[in-house]
């Protein structure tokens, strides 16, 4: 299962002329703003390609272009003189570019490493998604410091800032909000999804105690998830992944309540028959009653086996349908809500 990793890079751009006349405070700010805008465009190209199923090689190439743009912008800004000896605004912009570059390198590598083990447990998945959110928050905090420096510079030099969100900024905000929404739905899905894997493992090992313990946990997680889903509002009117998650959780509830009884009956019958067979094979001259009891045991295990196999076939079909529906909903959700940007 592939996850979309994105970073929030959201700067407020002010409209200035971009001639490199650093004697004019508006032009000074405009030059820095242009560098930030260039980075944001590369970011959106990378994010759009990641979300819309572009080949991994192309996505990685776009990430490298983003890194190059960050470095170039940082060098362009650091090469600026201070404005009338005041270097604070310039240095704040350079610091943010350094932060952004480090995030794309160091934090990105950590997240990729965490992704490799994220599916091993719910805790690992939660930590992976939380790491993504912390990285975005780190950038957001850096962005707030950058905006504060911009306001201080503007006030000090009598520049009138217009607080308006750009189209590019709107796109990046939507990506951020979309990811947060997806994370909360995904964790609701993943907890019982992983728990069912433990249940199926116990079934494969004929572990009756493990089956009972894991099915009870699965039922609890699925029911808890259904309650949580009821409190989550649709994303921009789109309830598709919540609905797909609900379908998946309802499958788990039905699996435990309606189907696990057949599984437990099979293993108990199998266990009883093993005892009957062992005792029967000890007898060199069994009585008619003993033969009848053995034959009944054979009939019981055959009946239980047939029911078990049919039960598994039904579950496998329903599980596959629900998972396909879930995966399709996730793909459609990202395709529909991630802005297309070249």
What are the residue ranges of the model-derived segments?
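Post-signal peptide N-terminal segment of secreted/secretory-pathway proteins
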Residues: 47-130
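Generic structural concept
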Residues: 67, 94-97, 101, 219, ...
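Short, solvent-exposed, charged loop/turn and helix-capping segments
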Residues: 73-94, 113-114, 225-247, 261-270
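A structural signal for well-ordered alpha-helices, especially hydrophobic packing surfaces
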Residues: 43, 47, 74-77, 101-108, ...
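Bacterial Sec-dependent N-terminal signal peptides
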Residues: 1-27, 342
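C-terminal amphipathic alpha-helix
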Residues: 21-54, 115-211, 215, 270-342
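Interface faces of extended alpha-helical assemblies
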Residues: 38, 110, 188-191, 195, ...
